[in-house]
Design a protein with these regions (language model features):
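Signature of long, low-cysteine stretches enriched in small and polar/charged residues
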Residues: 104-146
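Secretory pathway targeting signatures of secreted, lumenal, and periplasmic proteins
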Residues: 48-87
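N-terminal "mature-domain start" segment
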Residues: 25-63
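Mid-chain, structured segments of secreted extracytoplasmic proteins
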Residues: 75-115
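Bacterial N-terminal signal peptides that target proteins for export
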Residues: 1-10
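C-terminal motif of bacterial Sec signal peptides marking the signal peptidase cleavage site
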Residues: 18-20
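Surface-exposed amphipathic alpha-helical segments
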Residues: 151-191
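Repetitive helical segments and hydrophobic/amphipathic motifs
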Residues: 13-14
Length: 191
């Protein structure tokens, strides 16, 4: 046997061994579908005269930050949109209230107002958590929750205040900002 025949046979054997078989195969990998894929999600939103840019997104939640702020916990204002394809609006509210009452998120004040059987608005005021640098400020969340054909959409407009802020003014601020938020929140609807 000549060197060329041996080399060809060796290369052919290695190719068959590494390839697994002589027939070409196609493998399709299906990536998990993102709940956000079912909605029209903007790249930026404007609320109360400020522009927020989409900077972070996972399968369920998109976070919009002010242009000069980084992803993470050190934001001053934040807009987020979460879509849960399987959530029931009533169960979602019950679970949220249970978590708030349990102190899971620290001390919090909250209120929920039903708009109809498919939508409600809410606010939360989270108190600073001593010793936790990520949660060492007051945080107010203005929230709209709405059942859509493609899932439950939860929109938050969050504002942080120093832990020395006069919280006696928070309820007046919520009353002032809630109509602005509801009128200007991103109109994320099913595709």
């Amino acid at each position: 046997m000549s060197f060329k025949k041996v080399s060809f046979a060796a290369v052919a054997a290695v190719c068959l061994f590494l390839g697994g078989c002589t027939q070409p195969r196609t493998t399709q990998i299906e990536l998990p579908k993102s709940a956000l894929d079912s909605v029209n999600l903007p790249n930026e939103v404007a609320i109360d005269g400020e522009k927020f840019i989409l900077k972070q997104k996972n399968a369920r939640t998109a976070e919009f930050y002010l242009p000069n702020e980084k992803v993470g916990f050190k934001w001053s204002k934040l807009v987020s949109v979460t879509v849960d394809e399987n959530a029931d609006i009533n169960e979602y509210q019950k679970t949220f209230v249970t978590a708030l009452k349990s102190g899971q998120f620290g001390k919090a004040e909250y209120d929920f107002k039903s708009i109809n059987d498919k939508e409600y608005q809410a606010y939360t005021i989270y108190y600073p958590i001593a010793g936790n640098p990520d949660f060492d400020n007051y945080e107010i969340n203005l929230i709209n929750v709405k059942s859509l054909n493609c899932g439950l959409r939860v929109t938050h407009y969050a504002l942080k205040f120093l832990n020395i802020a006069d919280r006696s003014k928070f309820h007046a601020l919520i009353k002032q900002k809630m109509p602005i938020f509801l009128a200007q929140m991103p109109q994320v609807e099913c595709k």
